[in-house]
């Protein structure tokens, strides 16, 4: 009986503590560039609707608590290991979390990660309108569809050793074709704990945006 009472007391204490610290926003003070407004953004995150561990509303709330102004949910199109348990389309995470984001005054960017072998690797399509249209086996057709939706295309973790064993980021002919068409807009320099210094030269030489994201899957 004493053990049970102690367990209940500890559980209640932990619950009380978690409630006391949740819902708090940790502001990041980053000055504006003259003539612009600086926003803190994460353009690469995952939820349970691909290979992430959090429900979409939790991911959005987490971003707000971390002090971000905008977040993109970019679940994989081709890799959905929880699909046997979650019967939904590729817009589900956006649909579920939009109301929560609006309530937090957080900009929620509609996105998806087009997930292919290297090359071309993994690319985020940001600011899309319908992820369900990005299911063509032809990679270039998927990118074209995203671009027609107004997408910003980002080349993700180009030096990720699971796809690039030597860890050296490269622009392959298919990437150069995207650049020539104006269909590639940025490359990740930072991805979670990794950074790829050569990306700075790639972006400078091809007039692409230098990106940094969490690629968060857990918490």
Model-derived features: where do they sit?
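Residues embedded in well-ordered secondary-structure elements
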Residues: 12, 30-32, 176
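Divalent-metal (Mg2+/Mn2+/Ca2+)-assisted nucleotide/phosphate chemistry catalytic cores
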Residues: 153, 162
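Bacterial N-terminal signal peptides
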Residues: 7-18
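Extracellular glycoside hydrolase catalytic/binding regions
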Residues: 158-160
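Boundary at the C-terminal end of the N-terminal hydrophobic targeting segment
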Residues: 20-23
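Positively charged n-region of N-terminal signal peptides that target proteins for export
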Residues: 1-5
């Amino acid at each position: 009986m004493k053990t049970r009472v102690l367990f209940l007391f500890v559980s209640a204490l932990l619950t009380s503590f978690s409630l006391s610290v949740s819902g708090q926003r940790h502001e990041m003070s980053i000055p504006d560039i003259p003539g612009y407004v600086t926003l803190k953004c994460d353009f690469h995150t995952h939820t349970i609707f691909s290979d992430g561990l959090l429900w979409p509303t939790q991911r959005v709330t987490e971003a707000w608590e971390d002090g971000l102004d905008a977040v993109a949910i970019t679940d994989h199109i081709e890799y959905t290991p929880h699909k046997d348990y979650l019967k939904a389309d590729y817009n589900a995470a956006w649909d579920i979390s939009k109301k929560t984001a609006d309530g937090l005054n957080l900009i929620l960017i509609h996105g998806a990660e087009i997930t292919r072998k290297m090359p071309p690797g993994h690319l985020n399509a940001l600011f899309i309108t319908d992820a369900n249209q990005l299911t063509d086996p032809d990679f270039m057709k998927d990118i074209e569809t995203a671009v027609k939706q107004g997408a910003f295309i980002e080349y993700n973790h180009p030096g990720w050793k699971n796809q690039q064993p030597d860890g050296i980021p490269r622009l392959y002919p298919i990437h150069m074709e995207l650049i020539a068409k104006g269909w590639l807009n940025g490359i990740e320099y930072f991805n979670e704990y990794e950074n790829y210094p050569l990306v700075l030269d790639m972006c400078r030489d091809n007039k692409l945006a230098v990106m940094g994201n969490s690629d968060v899957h857990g918490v």
